[in-house]
Amino acid sequence: MNKSIAPAPVVAAGDVKFGNALPLSVIAGPCQLESRAHALEVAAALQEIGKRLGIGIVYKTSFDKANRTSAASARGIGLDGALPIFAEIRDSIGLPVLTDVHEAGQCARAAEAVDILQIPAFLCRQTDLLLAAAATGRIVNVKKGQFLAPWDMGNVVAKITSAGNPKVLVTERGVSFGYNTLVSDMRALPIMAKTTGAPVIFDATHSVQQPGGKGTSSGGEREFVPVLARAAVAVGVAGVFIETHPDPDHAPSDGPNMVPLRDFESLLRTLMEFDALAKRRSGAGTI
Protein backbone atom coordinates (compact mmCIF):
# COMPACT_ATOMS: atom_id res chain seq x y z
CA MET A 1 0.00 0.00 0.00
CA ASN A 2 1.12 3.56 -0.72
CA LYS A 3 0.93 6.46 1.64
CA SER A 4 -2.68 7.58 1.99
CA ILE A 5 -3.87 10.69 0.22
CA ALA A 6 -6.61 12.91 1.56
CA PRO A 7 -10.17 11.93 0.65
CA ALA A 8 -11.98 14.36 -1.61
CA PRO A 9 -14.33 16.71 0.27
CA VAL A 10 -16.76 16.50 -2.66
CA VAL A 11 -17.38 13.46 -4.85
CA ALA A 12 -19.61 13.28 -7.90
CA ALA A 13 -21.54 10.32 -9.27
CA GLY A 14 -22.64 11.61 -12.64
CA ASP A 15 -24.46 14.85 -11.92
CA VAL A 16 -25.06 13.97 -8.26
CA LYS A 17 -22.58 15.61 -5.89
CA PHE A 18 -21.93 14.67 -2.28
CA GLY A 19 -20.29 17.15 0.08
CA ASN A 20 -20.97 17.98 3.69
CA ALA A 21 -21.40 21.67 2.84
CA LEU A 22 -23.41 21.08 -0.36
CA PRO A 23 -27.18 20.71 -0.68
CA LEU A 24 -28.44 17.28 0.34
CA SER A 25 -28.23 14.39 -2.12
CA VAL A 26 -29.94 11.00 -1.82
CA ILE A 27 -29.13 7.33 -2.30
CA ALA A 28 -32.40 5.44 -2.74
CA GLY A 29 -33.95 2.29 -4.14
CA PRO A 30 -35.14 -1.17 -3.14
CA CYS A 31 -33.09 -3.42 -0.90
CA GLN A 32 -32.86 -6.26 -3.41
CA LEU A 33 -32.71 -6.34 -7.20
CA GLU A 34 -35.87 -8.38 -7.77
CA SER A 35 -36.28 -8.19 -11.56
CA ARG A 36 -35.57 -5.91 -14.50
CA ALA A 37 -39.15 -4.66 -14.60
CA HIS A 38 -39.25 -3.89 -10.89
CA ALA A 39 -35.88 -2.13 -10.97
CA LEU A 40 -36.82 0.05 -13.93
CA GLU A 41 -40.19 0.91 -12.36
CA VAL A 42 -38.60 2.18 -9.17
CA ALA A 43 -35.72 3.91 -10.95
CA ALA A 44 -38.08 5.79 -13.26
CA ALA A 45 -40.20 6.91 -10.31
CA LEU A 46 -37.12 8.13 -8.44
CA GLN A 47 -35.85 9.96 -11.50
CA GLU A 48 -39.14 11.84 -11.77
CA ILE A 49 -39.12 12.69 -8.06
CA GLY A 50 -35.58 14.00 -8.28
CA LYS A 51 -36.47 16.11 -11.30
CA ARG A 52 -39.55 17.60 -9.60
CA LEU A 53 -37.72 18.42 -6.38
CA GLY A 54 -34.40 19.43 -7.88
CA ILE A 55 -32.43 16.96 -5.78
CA GLY A 56 -29.74 14.53 -6.88
CA ILE A 57 -30.64 10.85 -6.51
CA VAL A 58 -28.41 7.80 -6.89
CA TYR A 59 -30.23 4.52 -7.47
CA LYS A 60 -29.23 1.68 -5.14
CA THR A 61 -29.99 -2.00 -5.07
CA SER A 62 -28.25 -5.28 -4.23
CA PHE A 63 -27.59 -8.08 -6.71
CA ASP A 64 -26.84 -10.50 -3.85
CA LYS A 65 -27.97 -10.30 -0.22
CA ALA A 66 -25.06 -12.37 1.01
CA ASN A 67 -25.68 -11.92 4.73
CA ARG A 68 -29.31 -13.00 5.06
CA THR A 69 -30.38 -14.31 8.47
CA SER A 70 -31.45 -17.66 6.99
CA ALA A 71 -29.90 -19.71 4.20
CA ALA A 72 -33.45 -20.24 2.91
CA SER A 73 -34.02 -16.51 2.30
CA ALA A 74 -34.00 -14.99 -1.19
CA ARG A 75 -30.62 -13.51 -2.10
CA GLY A 76 -31.15 -11.86 -5.49
CA ILE A 77 -30.48 -12.42 -9.17
CA GLY A 78 -26.68 -12.39 -8.99
CA LEU A 79 -24.04 -10.24 -10.63
CA ASP A 80 -24.36 -11.70 -14.13
CA GLY A 81 -28.05 -10.91 -14.26
CA ALA A 82 -27.64 -7.53 -12.61
CA LEU A 83 -24.99 -5.93 -14.82
CA PRO A 84 -27.19 -5.25 -17.88
CA ILE A 85 -29.95 -3.91 -15.62
CA PHE A 86 -27.53 -1.55 -13.88
CA ALA A 87 -26.31 -0.34 -17.26
CA GLU A 88 -29.86 0.23 -18.48
CA ILE A 89 -30.79 2.26 -15.40
CA ARG A 90 -27.69 4.40 -15.80
CA ASP A 91 -27.85 4.85 -19.57
CA SER A 92 -31.59 4.91 -20.30
CA ILE A 93 -33.10 6.41 -17.14
CA GLY A 94 -30.13 8.59 -16.32
CA LEU A 95 -29.57 7.79 -12.66
CA PRO A 96 -26.14 6.96 -11.24
CA VAL A 97 -26.12 3.47 -9.71
CA LEU A 98 -24.77 2.06 -6.44
CA THR A 99 -24.48 -1.58 -5.50
CA ASP A 100 -22.70 -3.45 -2.74
CA VAL A 101 -19.88 -5.92 -3.22
CA HIS A 102 -18.96 -8.76 -0.87
CA GLU A 103 -15.82 -10.24 -2.38
CA ALA A 104 -12.73 -8.67 -3.91
CA GLY A 105 -13.34 -10.56 -7.15
CA GLN A 106 -16.70 -8.83 -7.68
CA CYS A 107 -15.35 -5.28 -7.68
CA ALA A 108 -13.93 -4.90 -11.18
CA ARG A 109 -16.96 -6.51 -12.83
CA ALA A 110 -19.49 -4.48 -10.85
CA ALA A 111 -17.57 -1.30 -11.63
CA GLU A 112 -18.27 -1.84 -15.33
CA ALA A 113 -21.90 -0.82 -14.81
CA VAL A 114 -22.13 1.18 -11.57
CA ASP A 115 -20.85 4.50 -10.29
CA ILE A 116 -20.49 3.64 -6.60
CA LEU A 117 -19.28 0.43 -4.98
CA GLN A 118 -20.61 -0.04 -1.48
CA ILE A 119 -18.82 -1.96 1.26
CA PRO A 120 -21.33 -3.59 3.65
CA ALA A 121 -21.05 -2.70 7.33
CA PHE A 122 -20.06 -6.22 8.38
CA LEU A 123 -17.16 -6.10 5.90
CA CYS A 124 -15.90 -2.57 6.51
CA ARG A 125 -12.51 -3.71 7.86
CA GLN A 126 -11.77 -6.29 5.14
CA THR A 127 -8.58 -4.89 3.67
CA ASP A 128 -8.53 -6.93 0.44
CA LEU A 129 -12.12 -5.93 -0.35
CA LEU A 130 -11.47 -2.25 0.35
CA LEU A 131 -8.35 -2.22 -1.82
CA ALA A 132 -10.07 -4.03 -4.69
CA ALA A 133 -12.96 -1.57 -4.62
CA ALA A 134 -10.58 1.37 -4.51
CA ALA A 135 -8.55 0.01 -7.42
CA THR A 136 -11.54 0.32 -9.75
CA GLY A 137 -11.44 4.11 -9.49
CA ARG A 138 -15.13 4.20 -8.65
CA ILE A 139 -16.53 6.00 -5.63
CA VAL A 140 -16.40 3.71 -2.59
CA ASN A 141 -19.16 4.07 0.00
CA VAL A 142 -18.21 2.35 3.24
CA LYS A 143 -20.87 1.62 5.81
CA LYS A 144 -19.58 1.88 9.35
CA GLY A 145 -19.81 -1.47 11.10
CA GLN A 146 -22.42 -1.80 13.82
CA PHE A 147 -19.53 -2.81 16.07
CA LEU A 148 -17.21 0.10 15.22
CA ALA A 149 -16.63 3.47 16.88
CA PRO A 150 -17.02 6.44 14.51
CA TRP A 151 -13.43 7.58 15.07
CA ASP A 152 -12.19 4.19 13.88
CA MET A 153 -13.44 4.95 10.37
CA GLY A 154 -10.32 7.01 9.76
CA ASN A 155 -8.33 3.79 9.43
CA VAL A 156 -10.91 2.34 7.06
CA VAL A 157 -10.81 5.38 4.78
CA ALA A 158 -7.01 5.37 4.85
CA LYS A 159 -6.98 1.87 3.38
CA ILE A 160 -8.98 3.09 0.40
CA THR A 161 -6.99 6.25 -0.19
CA SER A 162 -3.74 4.29 0.11
CA ALA A 163 -4.70 2.75 -3.23
CA GLY A 164 -4.71 6.22 -4.78
CA ASN A 165 -8.49 6.65 -4.79
CA PRO A 166 -9.72 9.77 -2.95
CA LYS A 167 -13.39 9.20 -3.84
CA VAL A 168 -14.84 7.91 -0.57
CA LEU A 169 -18.17 8.22 1.25
CA VAL A 170 -18.72 7.06 4.83
CA THR A 171 -22.15 5.98 6.02
CA GLU A 172 -23.60 5.75 9.51
CA ARG A 173 -26.20 2.98 9.90
CA GLY A 174 -26.54 2.56 13.66
CA VAL A 175 -24.65 0.71 16.35
CA SER A 176 -25.57 -2.54 18.10
CA PHE A 177 -27.36 -1.95 21.39
CA GLY A 178 -28.14 -5.22 23.10
CA TYR A 179 -29.84 -7.99 21.17
CA ASN A 180 -31.68 -7.40 17.86
CA THR A 181 -31.48 -3.64 18.31
CA LEU A 182 -29.60 -0.72 16.79
CA VAL A 183 -29.40 2.86 18.01
CA SER A 184 -28.20 5.96 16.18
CA ASP A 185 -25.72 8.25 17.92
CA MET A 186 -25.85 11.53 16.01
CA ARG A 187 -22.45 12.47 17.40
CA ALA A 188 -21.04 9.92 14.97
CA LEU A 189 -21.82 12.18 12.01
CA PRO A 190 -19.54 15.13 12.87
CA ILE A 191 -16.97 12.74 14.35
CA MET A 192 -16.70 10.80 11.09
CA ALA A 193 -16.55 14.03 9.10
CA LYS A 194 -13.67 15.27 11.24
CA THR A 195 -11.70 12.03 11.49
CA THR A 196 -12.04 10.97 7.84
CA GLY A 197 -12.44 14.21 5.88
CA ALA A 198 -14.95 12.42 3.64
CA PRO A 199 -18.58 13.26 2.86
CA VAL A 200 -20.90 11.65 5.42
CA ILE A 201 -24.13 9.79 4.62
CA PHE A 202 -26.84 8.73 7.06
CA ASP A 203 -28.62 5.44 6.36
CA ALA A 204 -32.09 6.13 7.70
CA THR A 205 -33.65 2.77 6.90
CA HIS A 206 -31.04 0.27 8.09
CA SER A 207 -30.72 2.33 11.26
CA VAL A 208 -34.23 1.20 12.23
CA GLN A 209 -33.53 -2.44 11.37
CA GLN A 210 -33.90 -5.12 14.04
CA PRO A 211 -31.18 -7.61 12.98
CA GLY A 212 -32.51 -11.16 13.15
CA GLY A 213 -35.48 -9.78 15.04
CA LYS A 214 -38.04 -12.05 13.37
CA GLY A 215 -36.25 -15.33 13.92
CA THR A 216 -35.35 -16.26 10.35
CA SER A 217 -35.31 -12.67 9.07
CA SER A 218 -34.67 -9.16 10.28
CA GLY A 219 -37.41 -6.90 11.55
CA GLY A 220 -37.62 -3.13 11.50
CA GLU A 221 -39.46 -0.07 12.75
CA ARG A 222 -40.32 1.87 9.60
CA GLU A 223 -42.20 4.55 11.52
CA PHE A 224 -38.93 5.89 12.92
CA VAL A 225 -37.25 6.45 9.54
CA PRO A 226 -38.51 10.07 9.22
CA VAL A 227 -37.56 10.78 12.84
CA LEU A 228 -33.95 9.71 12.46
CA ALA A 229 -33.63 11.16 8.96
CA ARG A 230 -34.73 14.60 10.16
CA ALA A 231 -32.30 14.45 13.07
CA ALA A 232 -29.37 13.51 10.84
CA VAL A 233 -30.13 16.08 8.16
CA ALA A 234 -30.38 18.77 10.83
CA VAL A 235 -26.75 18.00 11.67
CA GLY A 236 -25.75 18.88 8.11
CA VAL A 237 -24.79 15.68 6.27
CA ALA A 238 -23.85 15.22 2.62
CA GLY A 239 -26.63 12.76 1.93
CA VAL A 240 -29.21 10.32 3.18
CA PHE A 241 -29.58 6.66 2.24
CA ILE A 242 -33.21 5.52 2.15
CA GLU A 243 -34.47 2.20 0.86
CA THR A 244 -37.87 2.47 -0.79
CA HIS A 245 -40.22 -0.01 -2.45
CA PRO A 246 -43.71 0.10 -4.03
CA ASP A 247 -44.92 -2.64 -1.66
CA PRO A 248 -42.43 -3.08 1.18
CA ASP A 249 -44.64 -5.43 3.17
CA HIS A 250 -44.22 -7.99 0.39
CA ALA A 251 -40.57 -7.29 -0.44
CA PRO A 252 -38.17 -10.25 -0.33
CA SER A 253 -35.80 -8.51 2.11
CA ASP A 254 -35.79 -5.61 4.58
CA GLY A 255 -39.45 -4.82 4.01
CA PRO A 256 -40.10 -3.77 7.64
CA ASN A 257 -37.69 -0.86 7.40
CA MET A 258 -38.23 0.31 3.81
CA VAL A 259 -40.25 3.45 3.06
CA PRO A 260 -43.27 2.95 0.78
CA LEU A 261 -42.55 4.60 -2.56
CA ARG A 262 -45.79 6.57 -2.29
CA ASP A 263 -44.41 8.32 0.82
CA PHE A 264 -40.91 8.95 -0.48
CA GLU A 265 -41.42 12.32 -2.17
CA SER A 266 -43.12 13.84 0.86
CA LEU A 267 -40.28 12.68 3.10
CA LEU A 268 -37.69 14.19 0.76
CA ARG A 269 -39.49 17.54 0.72
CA THR A 270 -39.29 17.67 4.50
CA LEU A 271 -35.64 16.64 4.56
CA MET A 272 -34.75 19.29 2.00
CA GLU A 273 -36.28 21.94 4.27
CA PHE A 274 -34.26 20.69 7.23
CA ASP A 275 -31.11 20.61 5.10
CA ALA A 276 -31.57 24.16 3.85
CA LEU A 277 -32.10 25.43 7.38
CA ALA A 278 -29.09 23.58 8.80
CA LYS A 279 -26.71 24.77 6.10
CA ARG A 280 -28.09 28.30 5.95
CA ARG A 281 -27.60 28.78 9.68
CA SER A 282 -24.07 27.44 9.65
CA GLY A 283 -23.07 29.13 6.42
CA ALA A 284 -21.39 26.02 5.03
CA GLY A 285 -22.81 22.93 6.63
CA THR A 286 -22.60 22.05 10.29
CA ILE A 287 -20.14 19.16 10.23
Swiss-Prot record:
Catalytic activity, reaction form: D-arabinose 5-phosphate + phosphoenolpyruvate + H2O = 3-deoxy-alpha-D-manno-2-octulosonate-8-phosphate + phosphate
Name of the protein in its database record: 2-dehydro-3-deoxyphosphooctonate aldolase
Pathway(s) annotated for this protein in UniProt: Carbohydrate biosynthesis; 3-deoxy-D-manno-octulosonate biosynthesis; 3-deoxy-D-manno-octulosonate from D-ribulose 5-phosphate: step 2/3; Bacterial outer membrane biogenesis; lipopolysaccharide biosynthesis
EC nos: 2.5.1.55
Gene Ontology molecular-function annotations: 3-deoxy-8-phosphooctulonate synthase activity
Cellular localisation: Cytoplasm
Main location: cytoplasm
Native source organism of the sequence: Rhodopseudomonas palustris (strain HaA2)
Zinc listed as a keyword: no
